[in-house]
Amino acid sequence: KGVMAGGPEAMYRAKENSEDDEDAARKDLEEAGMKKGDLLIGLAASGQTPYVLSGMKKAKEEGALTISISCVEEDKIGEYADIPIRLLCGPEILTGSTRLKAGTAEKMVLNMISTGAFVLCGKVYENLMVDLIPSNSKLVKRETRIVQEATGADEEEAEKALRECSRSAKEAIVMIKLGCDAESAKLALKKAGGFVRKAIKQ
């Protein structure tokens, strides 16, 4: 889940004063159901945005793990972070326009974190996104290619396995790799906690 100063509408219409609303941050996190054991990543290019700072404090009170991402050497949000990340990208070409270098740098770090999380959750096999949802024709074709690349199967065999596995690329890969039926592949994957590599090596 993600919360931001000003709410979702602030994505499309600027609400500059909302970043100073400390109470809103606490309320937003409560509504999001944040609890002990969760992870909160606080982003503020300046390292001192009141909304983010308040959210970091709330997370610490709840016993959540905290990561801060700022673009300055000395920040306030880092004081409340278990893992402070400071991206020293230097001044913006347009003074104060942190959507440029700072925003881009923060987005790159978020990409790294989310990609790592995907790997740790078993959504990746080798370098393939095996847990994608084939919600359009492009993704249906990509899913077939993923099964082919992971197993060495031809298109016909990959498609057959996907149909038998209710379009689950993970199950189709395990099925082909182990030479078993769809139900056995599903069971092997369940025993492996959703990790394709573990399911194949059981």
Task: Please name every model-derived segment.
Residues 1-108, 117-121:
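Glycine-rich phosphate-binding loops that contact phosphosugars or nucleotide phosphates
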Residues 97-105, 109, 128-135, 139:
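Alpha-helix N-cap/loop-to-helix boundary motif
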Residues 117-202:
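Short, amphipathic alpha-helical interaction segments embedded in low-complexity terminal/linker regions
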